[in-house]
Regions:
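N-terminal signal-anchor transmembrane alpha helix
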Residues: 7-37
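Hydrophobic alpha-helical transmembrane segments of polytopic
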Residues: 9-20, 82-85, 89, 120-127, ...
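Individual transmembrane alpha-helix segments
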Residues: 60-98
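C-terminal ends of transmembrane alpha-helices
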Residues: 26-31, 58, 129-143, 190-208
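Extracytosolic (periplasmic/ER-lumenal) interhelical loops and adjacent juxtamembrane/interface segments
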Residues: 40-74
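Internal transmembrane alpha-helix with an interfacial aromatic "cap," most often the third helix
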Residues: 24-30, 83-117, 162-170, 235-238
Length: 247
């Protein structure tokens, strides 16, 4: 049983993050470019500062533009890579937290740690569902549904990180240094949530400046990279635990 749990908490997250990162890089390299008339921006490549990650997952480019003269290019290759990777992230997150509670029960950790791990599992399953939903509904297929999944994915992730940190804090086997890493991520995530809910709104029919766009785009990429780093830190912690337990 411990080998199965180790796979879902250590090996699978590493495999998934690697695949997702590679999918994003390839999708960005083959992205046909975009045109944002409201700020006078046009390119024939993917921009780290001017294109959202969700644009990699769109069916066509420039679907948010009102001007019908702007060409909408097919984006199927990038869409399949990015959305496929994002769905995999969601599924892995669900499997990670489904097995998260099992490890604390299996090693007979503290009663508080076991209790909070069960609550964490439920929120983790919900977060994974929302992330998979972002990939299943491209923003140009249904913008409202896509934004709903994306916003609630990050909102749920905030509460998930808090519960995860509490669970590890009460653990008799996991070092509290892993709590510090996740708490730091919670703070960064809180700042990002303020940006997406109360910052400049970017979308079809919205009026925004180039700096507004860059703020949202860079913030999005920063939180995704920080999230992957936070997960890998937890993976390392579990790997250390499993090695000690195995020995």
């Amino acid at each position: 049983m411990i080998k199965k749990i180790r796979f879902y908490l250590v090996r699978l997250p590493i495999i998934t993050i690697t695949i997702f990162f590679c999918c994003c890089v390839i999708a960005a390299l083959i992205y046909p470019g975009s045109h944002k008339e409201i700020i006078g921006y046009q390119s024939d490549y993917y921009s780290f500062t001017h294109n959202f990650l969700s644009e990699l997952g769109s069916l066509k480019t420039n679907t948010d533009e009102i001007n019908t003269a702007i060409i909408q290019k097919d984006n199927t290759p990038s869409m399949l890579l990015f959305n496929g990777g994002l769905i995999l992230i969601g599924a892995t997150l669900m499997l990670f937290y489904y097995n998260f509670k099992k490890v604390f029960a299996f090693i007979e950790d503290s009663s508080k740690s076991i209790f909070y791990s069960k609550i964490t599992m439920l929120v983790g399953l919900l977060a994974g569902f929302f992330y998979a939903g972002v990939g299943l509904v491209p923003h140009d297929l249904h913008f409202g549904a896509h934004v709903f999944f994306a916003n609630f994915a990050f909102l749920t992730l905030f509460f998930l990180c808090i519960l995860h940190s509490i669970t590890v804090y009460y653990s008799n086997f996991l070092n509290n240094s892993y709590v510090i890493g996740y708490v730091a991520f919670c703070i960064v995530l809180f700042v990002y949530l303020r940006i997406i809910f109360f910052g400049p709104q970017i979308g079809p029919g919205k009026i925004y400046s180039e700096s507004d766009l860059m703020l949202q785009v860079i913030a999005q990429k920063s939180i995704v990279l920080t999230f992957m780093a936070a997960i890998l830190q937890q993976v390392y912690g579990f790997n250390v635990l499993f090695k000690k337990y195995h020995n």
